[in-house]
Each structure stands twice: as C-alpha cells, then as structure tokens.
Amino acid sequence: MHTGLEISIPHNLQMSKLLDTINSPSDLKKLTLDELRELAVQIREELVNRVTLNGGHLASSLGVVELTIALHRVFESPKDKIIWDVGHQSYAHKLLTGRREQFATLRQHGGLSGFTCRDESPHDPFGAGHASTSISAGLGMAVARDLAKEDYSVISVIGDGAISGGMSFEAINNAGHLHTKFIVILNDNGMAISPSTGALSKFLNNVRFDPRFEFAKRGAKQTITNMPFGKSVWAFTKSIKRKFEKSMLPGSLWEELGFIYLGPVDGHNIRELEAALKCAKDFESQPVLIHMITKKGKGYDDAEADAVKYHGIAPKSGGLKSGHGLSYSQVFGQTLHKIMSDNPKVVAITAAMTDGCGLSEVAADFPDRVFDVGICEQHAVTFAAGMATQGYIPVVVIYSTFLQRSFDQIIHDVCLQKLPVVFAIDRGGIVGDDGKTHQGIFDLSFMSLIPDMIVTAPSDENDLQHLLYTAVNSGKPFALRYPRGFGEGVETEGTLRNIPIGENEVLASGSEIAIFATGKSVAFAKEAMEILAESGIKPTLVNNRYISPLDTELILKIAGNHKYLITVEENVLSGGLGSRINTILAEAGLVNAVKIANIAVPDKFVEHGNQSLLRAKYGLDGKGIAQKVLSLMANTGEAKHQQILCP
C-alpha cells in the first residue's frame, strides 16, 4: 500500500535514529531546520506503524506533527501549558514528551491513553476526550496564573470542528472580555472553515509576525496621539484599517471578540509556525488567536484522500473496522431509513456523527430531513424539542458519552414538556480502547431518573428495529440504548411492530434462579446458561428490554417463585437496572424472600482496553456471569443481597 511518506516504513517497526534521540522537548532545540523536517517524517512513520497495529485516531495526529514540534521548541513544557482539545491529535506530543518508549502500549490495557491524561504525564496539564473544552480550561489556567502572579504561557489547540461547539464560543467571549494573556491555536484542516489564503494574507502575516512591526505600530500610535488632533487622526486611521480588514481578511471576527488575530499560517511550515508562536508569545495583555491551515492525514496518501475514514481506525488494520454481519449502528440506520420512507414527519438529528451513527445512507436519501448540527449536543436536543412542538418526530442520534453533555436540555426542554423526542443512544455500555472518557456506562442511570422518559435497551437486532419503531410511534420522550460493535447475527423480521411499553420478555423458563439481563448482557447471559447447563442448572432468563418503566408485575411474579435473582447490565450499579429492581423488591417486602445479586460495572471510571478484556475483568461476559451464579448459589451463609461488581 502506497503511503506517500517520504521515507518507506520499516517493517521491523524500529524508529530511526533521530526520533530515538528525543527524550524530552528540550532535545528539539538542538536540531537544525533540515533535521526538524526529517524528524517530522520519522514521527509520521511511527504514527502510521503504531496506529495501524493498535488502532486509534490517525488522520488528526498526522495533521499536527509540525505544529507539535514548533510548540515544543518555542515553549517550555510542562512549565508552559499546552492543552489539546479532544486530545486525539496528541500522539506526536506523547512521542516528544518522554513517552516514546511506552508508545507501543498506546490504547492497550495498562498502557498509554489515546487522549491526554493528567495521570500520565506532567506534559498533559488537562485531560480530554470530549470536544470544545480546551479554551475554557486554558483560560482558567491563565487567570489562575495571573492571580498567583506567576509567569508562564498557556496555549489551547482546537480544531475547526471542535470550535463549533457552543462551549468554545462561551470561552472565547469570556477571554476577550478579560483581556488575559492567552494563546488559542485554531487548527483548520479545511473540513469546516475555508479562509482566505492568498498572497495578500501571506504578505500581511509576514509583516505581523515581525516583532519590529508591533514595535513600530506602538511607536506610531504614541507619536500621532501626542500631536494636535492626533487622537482623532489615530481613530480615523484605525477605522480605515478595520474596514479594509473586514472586507479582505478572515480575522476581523476574532478582533471584534477581543483577540489579536494572526494567520492564516501554513501548519506544515515549521519556520512559519515558530514565527507565529514567538509573536503570539510576546503579547502581554490580550488573547491571541493563531489561525493555522493543515491537511488532515498529512503524509499518508490514504488518510489524505479519505480523512473521515481514517479519523479512527481499528487495530491491525489500515482501514475501517471489519467483522461479520451488521453493526448495531448499521441496523439502526437501515431501520430508520425504512421508517422515514413511510413517515415524512420523522427527522434525524446528529452532532457531527453522521457516519459513525450509521446515518450516511439516510442523509443521502433524505438530505432535507437529516440535520448534522456539529459538535453541539445541547443545541441538538433543544433543536429537536422545537421541531417536536410543530408536529415532527425527531430522532436524536448521539453516542452515549456525548449525550451526557445535554442532560439539562433533556430534562428542561424535552421531558418537562412531554415532547415526543427519540434518543438513539449509540455506543452504550463498554466501548473499549478509547477508555474513561468514552465508556457509555452512565446512560441507563441518568436517563432512567428523569420523569416521563421511557428507557430501553434492545437485546439484538430484532429488538432494536422493533423498539425504534415503537419509539417513533409512542408520542413520548423515548431513549433507545444500543452497544458498539456487531449484532448477534439474528435474522430480522420483515415487518416492524410495536412492543408494548414496559413489557419485558421471558426467553427461557427455569427453576430456582432467574437472570434479568438488559441489552448486550442478554447475549452473555445466554452464554452463561450454556455453561450452567453443564452443572445441571437451568435458570429463567428475562430480556429486560424496558428499564423505565420496569415490568413490575413480571419482576414480582418471578421473585415469588425463585430462590435467587440476578441482574446483569453494562452500566454502573448506582441507578441502573439492578438498583431499580432492588427498590421494587424492597417496596414489596421481598428482600428477605429471595437472594439477590447485581452484576454491573463498578461505580468508577473504566480504563481503556478492548471490550472482551474489560468484560472479562468486570465479570460481565458469559463465564463471569456463570461464576457469579454458582458463587451465589453456593454461598448460602452470606447476606441475602449481594452486589457483584468484579471477579
């Protein structure tokens, strides 16, 4: 496969000598410009090699190699604070800040995180994983610095996608008001913003980056304002300058917001980047925005040609994740397509996740009814609420981890008004290698506690399609939570049907022990039943597809004729399925009549690691569930209520 790298990728995956000599950012200051360019090539080689093996975010990291080098030459990390928005483009930063020898462990269990992490290195002053946080965090650090009368620089690096988030503009507005010394680097990779990059802009940037220009400007202001009528002359001159810039230059918006604007800068030209950074560093009483133009996937032909595809790749593959059958996201997309074909009132809304959420074909066929609002989850929910008031049925499609950002809007703008908004919660449960910031382990809890919200988790592809159909027809706020990865391989029924709200399903009838599992955990409970059958144990298995409202009648009936009751979920224990069933049993006075165990994710932030490894570690796979069942049945001398969280 042709990569477009200037140096061929070594098959033995050993980094060549120059990169191997970089143990800290200070080592970069010894290199010549030619050596820095060579280093950039070697960094890209290592990124392609490692991410191809381990998986991760490739295109974004390839696009900021020169910026990373320039930042660490101009500034003194960790004294100076470099904050990477989202953090998925920080791989080169990790290589240059003392983590080169650990880089082989990237996104591996117990290894380096795929994002910035405060626990990992002092060079990561702020952890990330979600977008649009860097400017707020950086401004907070800069203000804290000034209050403490300390002296260091704070630099926030944010992409043109993340800057579309409302939180970014809140921070920009605040920063301009405070007039704090602070640098924001806008990494514009051409996927959202199209600024002027012509000869005039380049000429003016060459002037702006020259410290002599700033000195001359200040001197001219002092000279003119000291003359008779000088202040009026200076004001007139500035007004002419502003009018010219507004008509010709892309930075006028930022200057109106209180920032000094520098750019556009060639983000792959180390010399030009260093000049811009040094210039920005010298401004004392105003925030500076450096507008940098980069190529996402730079240096790797496949990634440059399809930056969306190579935004994130699977382990041991240079392309998209592979597997058998359809993923839950694909089944969702196909079902929604069918529903939208039949019902013109159904619309889809997503927050910069059209491809990841399986909406590409839907968007292609219904371009007027699919809305990608950018990285704006709060807006997405209230936008949906507004459409719902006018008779439309919005389906909001968001990853579980990002839905957390719109919690107030779900309560205030949807549920309080009982609006029929459907929440399609993708990547629910254990997500895997992206780690703590991306695990979808809180959604069952925070969605179930909201009054009037229906919360469901399908056990397979059939459940998913029927529950989506039910959600669209319910006329109520409705949450549909499904996992990352491929389905169970079941054959889907051709006709969609409503599943009565609150009605759960007995999949297998047994004796003594009952397992209430929800979502993906149903498949693992089935595996556990096969293991238990070898010991002559035949449990009752319930597909607990409705978490709110619960099927109280079924729970009480089964609790009344079984000795043991197990709940299984890929969600934290607090507020999840097990917690809610415990409450029902307590209110019915059955806590002492049946022995209970809740198998769930611990109430903690779950580390990165592949899904199978993490499920095994926390006892959520078939083997783990079977072991807990056997342990519960054997442990008759213990308290009747056990919360089983891990092996």
Swiss-Prot record:
One of its GO terms (biological process) is terpenoid biosynthetic process. It comes from Dehalococcoides mccartyi (strain ATCC BAA-2266 / KCTC 15142 / 195). Disulfide bonds: none annotated. HAMAP family: DXP_synth. Thiamine diphosphate binds at H88, G129, H130, A131, G161, A162, N189, Y300, E377. Catalyzes the acyloin condensation reaction between C atoms 2 and 3 of pyruvate and glyceraldehyde 3-phosphate to yield 1-deoxy-D-xylulose-5-phosphate (DXP). The keyword Calcium does not apply. This is 1-deoxy-D-xylulose-5-phosphate synthase. Binds 1 Mg(2+) ion per subunit. Homodimer. The gene is dxs. Its cofactor is Mg(2+); thiamine diphosphate. Pathway: Metabolic intermediate biosynthesis; 1-deoxy-D-xylulose 5-phosphate biosynthesis; 1-deoxy-D-xylulose 5-phosphate from D-glyceraldehyde 3-phosphate and pyruvate: step 1/1.
